[in-house]
Regions:
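His-Asp-centered metal-binding catalytic motifs of divalent-metal-dependent phosphohydrolases/nucleases
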Residues: 10-37, 41-49, 53, 60-77, ...
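Generic structural signal for hydrophobic core residues of well-folded globular domains
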Residues: 16-22, 73-74, 91, 102-111, ...
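Short acidic (Asp/Glu) and glycine-rich catalytic loops that position anionic groups and cofactors
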Residues: 22-30, 44-50, 77-83, 100-109, ...
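Histidine/acidic-rich helix-loop-helix segments that form or flank divalent-metal centers
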Residues: 58-116
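Charged substrate- and nucleic-acid-binding regions of tRNA-handling and nucleotidyl-transfer enzymes
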Residues: 50-55, 109-183
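Short, contiguous acidic/charged loop-to-helix segments that flank catalytic cores in large enzymes
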Residues: 29-41, 57, 86-92, 116-120, ...
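Short, small-residue-biased leader/transition segments that mark boundaries at the very start
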Residues: 2-7
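Active-site lining segments that contact anionic ligands and/or coordinate catalytic metals
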Residues: 10-14, 67, 94-102, 120, ...
Length: 183
């Protein structure tokens, strides 16, 4: 990867880190014990980030990537392969390694409370991610062994049902990758 090729993603990562908590102030609530919570700040933050980036006339590619990374920057999961496959599907194969970098950076910027546990979880997720890539496990429709053309060839009528069947197959294969076969 040349520096020139890497520059656009550096821009995306920097903008994501700048904007990832932009909605925290407006989403802050305090419970009866005086503990602050920021529920849904990630979703609201993605909306705010999108408006800011549009106003600043960023290109659609940057806008889409930053918005998605802001939306999922706080997405947490157990370090288990099926959870990582599910997250890769939600976040996107291309953005998932950047999601991991953002989670690490955000964790390092937070209080030390449970930092080691959080970093250990992220490291486990990263190990699962690398294993999924190594095994070429299915995490998206384009990786499914069965296509819409296959379903039509087997007698299914073209239409919305094909998309629904493919989505159901994808969900099954994300849970159990060994089922990703033509049969």
């Amino acid at each position: 990867l040349s520096l020139h090729d890497a520059l656009p993603i550096y821009k995306v990562l920097r903008l994501t880190m700048l904007l990832h908590d932009v909605a925290k102030p407006q989403m802050k609530t305090v419970d009866a014990d005086g503990v602050a919570h920021f529920k849904m700040h990630d979703v609201k933050g993605a909306e705010v980030a999108k408006r800011i980036l549009k106003r600043l006339k960023f290109d659609n590619d940057t806008l889409g990537k930053v918005t998605k990374l802001v939306q999922y920057h706080d997405y947490r999961m157990p370090a288990q392969p099926k959870n990582v496959r599910r997250a890769m599907n939600k976040i996107g194969e291309e953005l998932f390694p950047y999601y991991l970098e953002i989670r690490k950076a955000d964790t390092m910027a937070q209080s030390e409370y449970m930092r080691e546990e959080k970093l250990s979880n992220i490291a486990g997720i990263e190990r699962c991610y690398k294993e999924i890539l190594k095994k070429k496990e299915c995490v998206s429709l384009k990786m499914l062994a069965v296509s819409g053309s296959d379903l039509i060839a087997d007698g299914m009528q073209p239409g919305k049902q094909i998309g629904a069947v493919l989505q159901a197959l994808l969900e099954l294969v994300i849970e159990q990758p060994e089922y990703n076969t033509k049969e």
